[in-house]
Structure formats: structure tokens, C-alpha cells
């Protein structure tokens, strides 16, 4: 790695979207759905040069004839054959690079099982022949992207939400909390409450439409009860949305009822604490001396934190839970949808990081377990 010309590759594999690009860039070059599709019926499309699998956007666009699978569930890789296909697609089709010529920085979910990071390491070195690689925890990268080394990150994506307290660059594993409530659940809930309004969304194709409605029209209310009253008494909160077939639907209190379930998981029939309480519980599991730093550096990250109004609501809810004299600051960077990737891009291009890479040589000498010694 003495040659500075070679840019490292940064790949953030999320449950919903894969973000990939080159270290030193300020945004990922490729963002595509983390899905692998296989034809439902063998040989239906004779002579069409049918492939046995499709990845990402191509799988999405052909979803009518495919069975779609997400190899990453709740942030953790569960299907390695499909994961390998996603990485192959990332390197060869999206970035158009030879992975054996670039160091690769991968990201992992907090509390990722040890066997998983070993498997990632093994695939990078043995299947893709990477010269060097590193595995970084997603939330830690988001914190770096915000220019901090101490703080608590609320990272909420498509498949899972975590609260991760970080002190001087190290995640504190005993205080990390996981909440299996994220973007995909909100989309499902919006499908359900729109059905109650008389609009039917059931297929996977229609689910994508609902996801778009969620991303474009939903917001978090500062005071849920007040907002419900406003919605009931006037049409000021109503918005219309045009479906692909030209039909126009109107959406009212669903706009804020959907993301409200982040704060009240009981809406989804879940008996867990909301994101505000989970953040607070996570802080309370930390040493009393660092709590002040965590309250003052609460960083939001991931696509599910993109709802307008979420930062103000978090501020209000955490202020209500915390000691009255505590200074609370919620940091919601505008680029937080990609902050894990951006943090990876920053880390992999630091001169001080270059000695941290696991080289192919070290891997050959020690095997996959090297990852636990070099990446923590």
C-alpha cells in the first residue's frame, strides 16, 4: 500500500440499499437495492438470454418474473451466496473495477456475530483476491462523518435500528441497543393504514410505490395528539400523490401516523421502547462520567432518520427523559442517508489509517480470525 495512486473501495452493505464508491469521494458512486432475483419459472423466456440471477436495479425492474430475496436481514448477512453476487455486481458492474487491485473497506452492523466478519474477510481475500481489506462498524463511521469521535449514534436504516454510544472512536458494546423496527416496517405499516383508507397496496411492486409515498410525504409530528386534532378538524395537512397509473390519492394523518411508530412501536404491535427511549436507555448503560458528552452529541444517521421534524421531536423527548440541567444536542446532518459511506470514505483515505488495513499476506499467515485482532 505504498502506492498512493490506488483508491480504496468503500462498500456499505445495508439491508435495503448498497452504497459503494471510492475513498476520498464525497458521495457514493453507486447506490442500488440489496436484492437478488431469480426467475420464478425456468426457461420461460427462451432465447432472451435469460440469466440465472439478477442483482439490484435490474432485479427490481424485472421483479414481475422474479422471486426477490434480500441477503441482508436486520443489518446482518444471512445468505452468503447471494451476498457474493451483490459484491460481484458492485465491483464489476457498478464501480467497474478489479477488486484485486484495490483495498476494500466494508461495513458491518453493530454486534455482528464474529463468524460473520470472518466470512466477509474470507470472501474478500479468497473469492475477490483483494490486496487488503478492513471491516468497520457502521455507526462509528457515521460519527466520523459528523467530525466527532465521541457521541451516541442513532442509526436507522431499512432493516434495523441501533443506538451506539462511542467514546474516543470506540463503540461501547455493552451499551449498544438494537431495535428491530426500521424503514421496511414503516413501509408495511403505511401500506396497512392506507388500506384502511380504502386504497389497496399488496404486491411487492405496490410496496415500492408506498415506500415512495413514505419518503416524499411523511413527517414526524412534534406533538402527536395536537397533530391528530388538527388533521381531524381541517384539511390543511392533506397532500395528494399521483400513482404510476395516473390515479391521484389523498393522504392525511397517515403522513405523521406512519413515522410516529418510531416513537410508539405499539402502533406496530411491538412491545418495545421507541427510538427516543432506546437512545436514553443506551446512554444510561454508559459510565456516568461520559453521559454528558453523549447527550450533547446525539447524531442521527441512516435513511429512516430523514423524516422532517424528527430531530426536533428527539430533542423534545430526550429533554423530557434526561436530567433537567443537561445540555442536549441532536445532530442531523443533511447527508445522513449516506453518512456511513461518507465516514468510510474519510477513514479509508486518512494517511494514519493505512497501517490498519489487513493485508493479503497477514490473512494468508493467520486466516480469517485476523479480523478480530485488526478491526475493532
UniProtKB/Swiss-Prot annotation:
Catalytic activity line of the entry: ATP + H2O = ADP + phosphate + H(+)
CDD domains in the record: ASKHA_NBD_actin
EC identifiers of the protein: 3.6.4.-
Record's subcellular location: Cytoplasm, Cytoskeleton
UniProt cross-references to InterPro entries, sorted A to Z: Actin (IPR004000), Actin/actin-like_CS (IPR020902), Actin_CS (IPR004001), ATPase_NBD (IPR043129)
Residue numbers of N-acetylaspartate PTMs: 3
Propeptide: 1-2
GO molecular function: ATP binding; hydrolase activity
One Gene Ontology cellular component annotation held by this UniProt entry: cytoplasm
Something else known: There are at least 12 actin genes in P.magellanicus. Only one actin gene is expressed in the adductor muscle.
Described function: Actins are highly conserved proteins that are involved in various types of cell motility and are ubiquitously expressed in all eukaryotic cells.
Similarity field: Belongs to the actin family.
Name assigned to this protein: Actin, adductor muscle
Species for this entry: Placopecten magellanicus
